[in-house]
């Protein structure tokens, strides 16, 4: 446990932020024992907090980042670096982009520094069988070693799975599950755990909404299901919720509504993989649960960032008075 005891979080965050303003792509090479310490300490914190987080607004919610470190820095510049704002990230920190290590290290460092104000959910890429293939394993092996990748795996296996904001907004990476009847089922999932090939945990990280599906449908991903608008409406009604907030799919404007604004998809990696001309978005939830969207245009476009008008959820949602 020496790695944890000697961890200088402020120094690590400072070095990770030093590349602000540099040409995108410049690496920050932390010491291996520092990264190991980040994994071990954050793992402790994840396990000390619920697998189904109960959070309070105001906070900012972000979708997939996928190793696009300089876009993550732009998100923080736009939304406010912690602790100026509270954050909830919906998973998929690693793979595909060029700087998964910087991305996950900064996020874990902020989790350690501000454990009650900064929250990270698990995405389907925080899973050994996926990030072994899509880039994170290769990045760890090239810049450090395979043992460090395995340390990250142990950390990812302890991430929380879902969050509920002020008893009204249900957040997860993928979507709903035909197995999900009670929130208690999520709370009963034991950590550490890998992501199974099917079932509740798999679906929460993998499923997608589909406007052409009635009920539950098959998916092109070959994992989990798609679900229609009626499934969303029934779920919200049953659990007295107002909105599902999820990530997992590239959307052109960085956010996209579904099922009469009862579900929103967030994607926070602009110009994803350099192949899509998508914007990235972050959803700000204020104390009254009014939601607005902050948009990151692809960096190459050199257009100013735009703020979309405030969007009420299904009319105006009033924040529950604290008992």
From Swiss-Prot:
Cellular localization per UniProt: Cytoplasm; Nucleus; Cleavage furrow; Nucleus, Nucleolus
Alphabetized InterPro entries for the sequence: Calcineurin-like_PHP_ApaH, Metallo-depent_PP-like, PP1_catalytic_subunit, Ser/Thr-sp_prot-phosphatase, STPPase_N
Cofactor note: Binds 2 manganese ions per subunit.
Residue ranges of the TM segments: none
GO cellular component, one term: cleavage furrow
Annotated residues for binding of Mn(2+) 1: 64, 66, 92
UniProt PTM comment: Phosphorylated by NEK2.
Residues recorded as bearing Phosphothreonine in the entry: 307, 311
Catalysed reaction, written as an equation: O-phospho-L-seryl-[protein] + H2O = L-seryl-[protein] + phosphate; O-phospho-L-threonyl-[protein] + H2O = L-threonyl-[protein] + phosphate
Residues at which Mn(2+) 2 binds: 64, 92, 124, 173, 248
Gene Ontology process terms (BP): cell division; glycogen metabolic process
Highest taxon of the lineage: Eukaryota
Enzyme category, top tier: hydrolase
Keywords: Acetylation, Carbohydrate metabolism, Cell cycle, Cell division, Centromere, Chromosome, Cytoplasm, Cytoskeleton, Glycogen metabolism, Hydrolase, Kinetochore, Manganese, Metal-binding, Mitochondrion, Nucleus, Phosphoprotein, Protein phosphatase
List of residues that carry N-acetylalanine: 2
Any GO MF annotation of the entry: metal ion binding
EC identifiers of the protein: 3.1.3.16
Family from the record: Belongs to the PPP phosphatase family. PP-1 subfamily.
Self-association and partners: PP1 comprises a catalytic subunit, PPP1CA, PPP1CB or PPP1CC, which is folded into its native form by inhibitor 2 and glycogen synthetase kinase 3, and then complexed to one or several targeting or regulatory subunits. PPP1R12A, PPP1R12B and PPP1R12C mediate binding to myosin. PPP1R3A (in skeletal muscle), PPP1R3B (in liver), PPP1R3C, PPP1R3D and PPP1R3F (in brain) mediate binding to glycogen. PPP1R15A and PPP1R15B mediate binding to EIF2S1. Part of a complex containing PPP1R15B, PP1 and NCK1/2. Interacts with PPP1R3B, PPP1R7 and CDCA2.
Protein name: Serine/threonine-protein phosphatase PP1-gamma catalytic subunit
Organism expressing this protein natively: Canis lupus familiaris
UniProt lineage: Eukaryota, Metazoa, Chordata, Craniata, Vertebrata
Gene that this polypeptide is encoded by: PPP1CC
């Amino acid at each position: 446990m020496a790695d944890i005891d000697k961890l200088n979080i402020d120094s690590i965050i400072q070095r990770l932020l030093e590349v602000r303003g540099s040409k995108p792509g410049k690496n920050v090479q932390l010491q291996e024992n520092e990264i190991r310490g980040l994994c071990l300490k954050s793992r402790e914190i994840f396990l000390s907090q619920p697998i189904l987080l109960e959070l309070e607004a105001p906070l900012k919610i972000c979708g997939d980042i996928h190793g696009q470190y300089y876009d993550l820095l732009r998100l923080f510049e736009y939304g406010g670096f912690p602790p100026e704002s509270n954050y909830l990230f919906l998973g998929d920190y690693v793979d595909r982009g060029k700087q998964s290590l910087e991305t996950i290290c900064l996020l874990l460092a902020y989790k350690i520094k501000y454990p009650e104000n900064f929250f990270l959910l698990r995405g389907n890429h925080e899973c050994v069988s996926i990030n072994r293939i899509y880039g994170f394993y290769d990045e760890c092996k090239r810049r450090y070693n395979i043992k460090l990748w395995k340390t990250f795996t142990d950390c990812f296996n302890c991430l929380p799975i879902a969050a509920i904001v002020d008893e009204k907004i249900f957040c997860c990476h993928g979507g709903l599950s035909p197995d999900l009847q009670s929130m208690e089922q999520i709370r009963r999932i034991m950590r550490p755990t890998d992501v199974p090939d099917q079932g509740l945990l798999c679906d929460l990280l993998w499923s997608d909404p589909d406007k052409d599906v009635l009920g539950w449908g098959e998916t092109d991903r070959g994992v989990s299901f798609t679900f229609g608008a009626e499934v969303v409406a029934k779920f919200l009604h049953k659990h007295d919720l107002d909105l599902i907030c999820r990530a997992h799919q590239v959307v052109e404007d960085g956010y996209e509504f579904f099922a009469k604004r009862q579900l929103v998809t967030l994607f926070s990696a602009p110009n994803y993989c350099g192949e899509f001309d998508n914007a990235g978005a972050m959803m700000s939830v204020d104390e009254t649960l009014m939601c607005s969207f902050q948009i990151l245009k692809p960096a190459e476009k050199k257009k100013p960032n735009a703020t979309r008008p405030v969007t009420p959820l299904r009319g105006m949602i009033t924040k529950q008075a604290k008992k």
